[in-house]
Amino acid sequence: MTTIRKKLVIVGDGACGKTCLLIVFSKDQFPEVYVPTVFENYVADIEVDGKQVELALWDTAGQEDYDRLRPLSYPDTDVILMCFSVDSPDSLENIPEKWTPEVKHFCPNVPIILVGNKKDLRNDPNTIRDLAKMKQEPVKPQEGRAMAEKINAFAYLECSAKSKEGVRDVFETATRAALQVKKRKKTRCLLL
């Protein structure tokens, strides 16, 4: 049986949980220390609907300093995980402001899975208190669903890398989305 290879790129604001999500899925361990990513690649094998898929996981940096570097990871992407953090309404706001335009520019027609990370913090008293000081509250599931509709995402899912809840679901859904897409013929650039 031949292995199908697909490329997944994860994007979203800095510190919204992208790297933790990838590490928990690919290595089954939660990193306790936050280290901002520049670019990392992981590979994970996943089986969906009887198909063996080798998923190349491309981590990206969310910080603005990397806005010019990040597009280097976009070519030949099969599926995008676009993340925000449930404990950061600002990160959800950046989905239509920053991430959707960037992704749709560099990856037109690539399916987007909108992912609400850090779901476990939605009911965390400290998180609720800290957000209340700024007249904010954790992102509600219906706000995430509405955003997914607004940006025309393939799916909306929530997960917690810390508790592992929903993690596998995110990658199974992403793999299904990647498998559904018929690859267009690669266009060659000609310089005359």
Swiss-Prot record:
Q: Which SMART domains match?
A: RAB, RAS, RHO
Q: Which residues form the propeptide?
A: 190-192
Q: Where does GTP bind?
A: 12-19, 59-63, 117-120
Its main subcellular localisation, reduced to a broad class, is membrane
Q: Which Pfam families match?
A: Ras
Q: What happens when the gene is disrupted?
A: Embryonic lethal. Embryos exhibit severe defects in head involution and imperfect dorsal closure. During head involution, the head structures fail to internalize resulting in holes in the dorsal anterior region of the cuticle. The disruption in the dorsal surface stretches the ventral surface, causing the cuticle to bow.
| Gene Ontology biological process | actin cytoskeleton organization; actin filament bundle assembly; actin filament organization; actin-mediated cell contraction; adherens junction maintenance; apical constriction; axon guidance; border follicle cell migration
Q: Which residues carry this modification: Cysteine methyl ester?
A: C189
Question: Which CDD domains does the annotation name?
Answer: RhoA_like
Residue numbers with lipid attached (S-geranylgeranyl cysteine) = C189
Keyword tags: Actin-binding, Cell membrane, Cytoplasm, Cytoskeleton, Developmental protein, GTP-binding, Lipoprotein, Membrane, Methylation, Nucleotide-binding, Prenylation, Sensory transduction, Vision
Q: Where is this motif: Effector region?
A: 34-42
Q: Name one GO cellular component term.
A: cell hair
What tissue specificity is annotated for this entry?
Answer: Expressed in hemocytes (at protein level).
Classification via Gene3D superfamilies: P-loop containing nucleotide triphosphate hydrolases
Query: Membrane topology for this entry?
Result: Lipid-anchor
Q: What InterPro entries does the record point to?
A: P-loop_NTPase (IPR027417), Small_GTP-bd (IPR005225), Small_GTPase (IPR001806), Small_GTPase_Rho (IPR003578)
Subcellular locations according to the entry: Cell membrane; Cytoplasm, Cytoskeleton; Apical cell membrane; Lateral cell membrane
Q: Which GO terms describe its molecular function?
A: actin binding; GTP binding; GTPase activity; kinase binding; protein kinase binding
Q: Which PANTHER family match?
A: RHO FAMILY GTPASE (PTHR24072)
Q: Which family is it part of?
A: Belongs to the small GTPase superfamily. Rho family.
Provide the assembly information. Interacts with capu. Interacts (via REM repeats) with Pkn (via N-terminus). Interacts (via N-terminus) with wash (via N-terminus). May interact with dia/diaphanous (via CBD/FH3 domain).
Q: Which NCBIfam families does the annotation name?
A: small_GTP
* Role of this protein: Has a role in regulating actin cytoskeletal organization: required during early development for proper execution of morphogenetic movements of individual cells and groups of cells important for the formation of the embryonic body plan. Plays a role in regulating dorsal closure during embryogenesis. During axis elongation, required for Rho-kinase Rok planar polarity and adherens junction localization as well as for generating a planar polarized distribution of the actin-binding protein Shrm.
The name of this protein is Ras-like GTP-binding protein Rho1
Organism for this UniProt entry: Drosophila melanogaster (Fruit fly)
